[in-house]
Amino acid sequence: GVSRQAVQKWETGVSVPELSKIIEISKYFGISLDTMLLGRTRRIVVDELKYKDIKPLYKNIHDWEFYASGIMDEYKQSTDEGLDIEQYKNLFEAVDKLPKDEIKNDLANVLQKIVINADIKKCYEYKEPSELTEIKALRKEYSITKKDPKNLEDKIYGAWMGRICGCMLGKSVEGVRSDELIPFLKETNNFPLHRYILKSDITKEISKKYNYDFMSRCYVDEIDGMPIDDDTNYTVLSQLIVDNYGRTFTPDNISKMWLKCQPKDAYCTAERVAFCNFVKGYMPPESAVHKIPYREWIGARIRGDYWGYINP
């Protein structure tokens, strides 16, 4: 019931066989659909899976979500926090070099326990509390300057526009290295930088010269409005938190809003892991530090502008 022409189209990718045809072919040749479609020589039935120790496919886990992938970031962060773990540096380095698999995962969990139970070095000279009352107790005194309500709207609008404009300026070249960015800017007559980088700057000849993929980026001369970006999403998300919970919102409210309003891939590094922690049932404040090597990265510092807007 299958013509030669149909098979040729399937082989070349011109068309895809209907499910009924696939079933007919598998029956005709006496092979299972698993073998035919997935290349498996043995069919795995549901009953087998019930008693199997199922493992994740570690290579498919994003590095930000795999604690072991950031184990040297954990070491650096922990030593910056004054934790006495230098004697384990060789262990951290050895685990870091392992392939991305179950063994690396298990050993990283052992190192995490070492970090959790480590003492602060006696010679550590900094005081870095996490509790708000303790932070306030250590801060310097400062005088509050009264703001003119007439100017606030214009200032807040300017701050929001500044964030958008600056974000768009960097969006076109996020991740590029200076040894490629500077030659590129010189070649496009934009060095020192005095205007936005344009799509019209990116010719095929220019793009072939660099490892950075300029062709796939977003540019101001091909858009009508600001595209979504994590560096602007959080400001909008903060507004939604206040709209839904008022000024007396709690960390738990924030976790619920994060899960509700954005998918996982909208978050990066520390925020990505915190999101995954919410999903797994870890709640604030533990969710902000549990298996997060990136916990003191710049993300939190650059997400707080909205709270300044509404508390002038």
Predicted regions and their residues:
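Short amphipathic alpha-helical surface patches that mediate protein-protein
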Residues: 12, 38-42, 256-259, 263
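Charged, helix-prone or intrinsically disordered regulatory segments positioned adjacent to compact structured domains
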Residues: 33-52
